[in-house]
Swiss-Prot record:
<dbReference type="InterPro" id="IPR011025">
    <property type="entry name" value="GproteinA_insert"/>
</dbReference>
<dbReference type="GO" id="GO:0003924">
    <property type="term" value="F:GTPase activity"/>
</dbReference>
<dbReference type="GO" id="GO:0031683">
    <property type="term" value="F:G-protein beta/gamma-subunit complex binding"/>
</dbReference>
<keyword id="KW-0342">GTP-binding</keyword>
<dbReference type="GO" id="GO:0005525">
    <property type="term" value="F:GTP binding"/>
</dbReference>
<comment type="function">
    <text>Guanine nucleotide-binding proteins (G proteins) are involved as modulators or transducers in various transmembrane signaling systems. The G(o) protein function is not clear.</text>
</comment>
<feature type="region of interest" description="G2 motif">
    <location>
        <begin position="176"/>
        <end position="184"/>
    </location>
</feature>
<feature type="binding site">
    <location>
        <begin position="42"/>
        <end position="49"/>
    </location>
    <ligand>
        <name>GTP</name>
    </ligand>
</feature>
<feature type="binding site">
    <location>
        <begin position="272"/>
        <end position="275"/>
    </location>
    <ligand>
        <name>GTP</name>
    </ligand>
</feature>
<protein>
    <recommendedName>
        <fullName>Guanine nucleotide-binding protein G(o) subunit alpha</fullName>
    </recommendedName>
</protein>
<keyword id="KW-0449">Lipoprotein</keyword>
<dbReference type="GO" id="GO:0046872">
    <property type="term" value="F:metal ion binding"/>
</dbReference>
<feature type="binding site">
    <location>
        <position position="184"/>
    </location>
    <ligand>
        <name>Mg(2+)</name>
    </ligand>
</feature>
<feature type="lipid moiety-binding region" description="N-myristoyl glycine">
    <location>
        <position position="2"/>
    </location>
</feature>
<dbReference type="GO" id="GO:0007188">
    <property type="term" value="P:adenylate cyclase-modulating G protein-coupled receptor signaling pathway"/>
</dbReference>
<keyword id="KW-0564">Palmitate</keyword>
<feature type="region of interest" description="G3 motif">
    <location>
        <begin position="199"/>
        <end position="208"/>
    </location>
</feature>
Length: 359
């Protein structure tokens, strides 16, 4: 009659180790199923970082007063940089100041540091210079011709709210934070939970020099959210001063959409800065056909112009089995982004369930 042979200590240890590994693998698998990684891509100045801020406001805890205060130096840096751009443009466009005192005030602003971290507050002479210059007729004329040079998208907002921004007790609110602009460098990840799912949104800098880092983020991506600035159709890249921004976005989208890493990945397209696009198409003479000769629609027709640009993106998709989900967005508008992002999350969940044959 045979007896049982007891396991050796080494065998018991190996079995325990195997059980721990199996348990960890099951836990990792559950976590993977409950975590959706969204890769946020697009060219520089497209509004990606603003989309991330909106996610924090809509699905996170928003911005505390302490967090909002940390943006003050950035906002002041944006304000100073925007005013410098206008003042330099006045010289190039040959626009005189409305009064002689403005020339001295302009020198005060032009002498400010370019560093965004330089200003937690401005001295009285700088504050006075900002306010007086904004009221100057020449500055106003130059500002009204901003389509003729490259002015930060947030400049109108900051100029129009200048009196509030320059108060001694000023604390940035969420709208001020949304309008703030710092070039994204490196990889920034934001996480939030909606309906028992964790979303990891990975934002990578869109400037050309940052794109070599993108491939580091391609693993386990469940959706790509590509952001394009509609209003860039008449503008050139800061990097080289000659490449059309919209053309750059189209080429970049084609490379991403048809990348082997994303054959089965949900592809969401945000046609962003729709508010600026509408204003430019409707109120300026910078007609779309002047920059994209293949556009044959009417001038000042926002719907026709946006349909044309959307179709240009769709044509860059070489895999006709792949569905692109386009949305017109204004990233600074929390209500708009809340509605659109709700649709986006539902789309991502549905596509992932279909891919797993659960629908």
């Amino acid at each position: 009659m045979g007896g049982c042979v007891s396991a050796t200590p080494e065998e018991r240890e190996a079995k325990t180790r195997s059980s721990v590994i199996d348990r960890q693998q099951r836990q990792d698998a559950r976590q993977y199923e409950n975590t959706i990684k969204i890769l946020l891509l697009g060219a520089g100045e497209s509004g990606k970082s603003t989309v991330v801020k909106q996610m924090k406001i809509i699905h996170g805890d928003g911005y505390s007063q302490t967090e909002x205060r940390s943006f003050k130096s950035v906002i002041y840096g944006n304000l100073a940089a925007s005013m410098r751009v206008v003042l330099n443009a006045m010289e190039k466009l040959g626009i005189p100041y409305g009064n002689q005192a403005s020339q001295e005030q302009a020198r005060v602003i032009l002498s400010l540091s370019n560093s965004l971290s330089s200003y937690e507050s401005f001295p009285p002479d700088v504050t006075s210079a900002f306010i007086s210059l904004w009221r100057d007729a020449g500055v106003q004329e130059c500002f009204s011709r901003a389509y003729e040079y490259q002015l930060n998208d947030s400049a109108p907002y900051y100029f129009q709210n200048m009196d509030r921004l320059l108060r001694e007790d000023y604390v940035p609110d969420e709208q001020d934070v949304l309008r703030s602009r710092v070039q994204t460098t490196g990889i920034i990840e934001t996480s939030f939970r909606v309906k028992q799912l964790t979303y990891r949104v990975v934002d990578v800098g869109g400037q050309r020099s940052e794109r070599r880092k993108w491939i580091q983020c391609f693993d386990d991506v469940r959706a790509v959210l590509f952001v394009c600035a509609l209003s860039g159709y008449d503008m050139t890249l800061f990097e080289d001063g000659k490449t059309n921004r919209l053309e750059e976005s189209l080429n970049l989208f084609q490379a991403i959409c048809n990348n082997k890493f994303f054959v089965k990945t949900s592809m969401i397209l945000f046609l962003n800065k729709a508010d600026l696009f509408r204003d430019k198409i409707t109120n300026s003479d910078r007609h779309l056909r002047l920059y994209f000769t293949q556009y044959t629609g009417p001038d000042r027709d926002v719907e026709a112009a946006s349909r044309f640009i959307q179709s240009e993106f769709m044509e860059r998709n070489l895999n006709k089995q792949k569905i692109i989900y386009p949305h017109l967005t204004t990233a600074t508008d929390t209500t708009n982004i809340k509605v659109v992002f709700g649709v986006v999350l539902d789309t991502i969940i549905r596509e992932n369930l279909e891919a797993a044959n659960l629908l």
